[in-house]
């Protein structure tokens, strides 16, 4: 990833952080009613609109 602007790198980092799974404590607290979140993005299937 050469010649990336700092803003673009920052947005990619944010998208990377947002793509994490639901925390274990949330799954335990809700008695497994919440096990996944709908905004999860797969690296191959979902496209990322980062400018």
Swiss-Prot record:
Q: Which family does it belong to?
A: Belongs to the eukaryotic ribosomal protein eL39 family.
Extract the Gene3D superfamilies matched here. Ribosomal protein L39e (1.10.1620.10)
Q: Does the keyword Lipoprotein apply?
A: no
Note the InterPro entries from the entry. Answer: Ribosomal_eL39, Ribosomal_eL39_CS, Ribosomal_eL39_dom_sf
PROSITE patterns recorded: RIBOSOMAL_L39E
Give the span(s) annotated as Disordered.
Answer: 1-23
Question: Per its record, how is this protein called by name?
Answer: Large ribosomal subunit protein eL39
Keyword Ribonucleoprotein recorded: yes
Q: Name one GO molecular function term.
A: structural constituent of ribosome
What GO terms fall under cellular component here? ribonucleoprotein complex; ribosome
One GO biological process this protein is involved in is: translation
Question: Bias category Basic residues: which stretches?
Answer: 1-19
The source organism is Methanosarcina mazei (strain ATCC BAA-159 / DSM 3647 / Goe1 / Go1 / JCM 11833 / OCM 88) (Methanosarcina frisia)
Cystine residue pairs: none
The UniProt keywords, alphabetically, are: Ribonucleoprotein, Ribosomal protein
First and last residue of the signal peptide: none
């Amino acid at each position: 990833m050469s010649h990336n602007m700092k803003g673009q790198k920052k947005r990619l980092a944010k998208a990377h952080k947002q793509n994490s799974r639901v925390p274990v404590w949330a799954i335990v607290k809700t008695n497994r009613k919440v096990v996944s979140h709908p905004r999860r993005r797969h690296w191959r299937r979902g496209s990322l609109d980062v400018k």
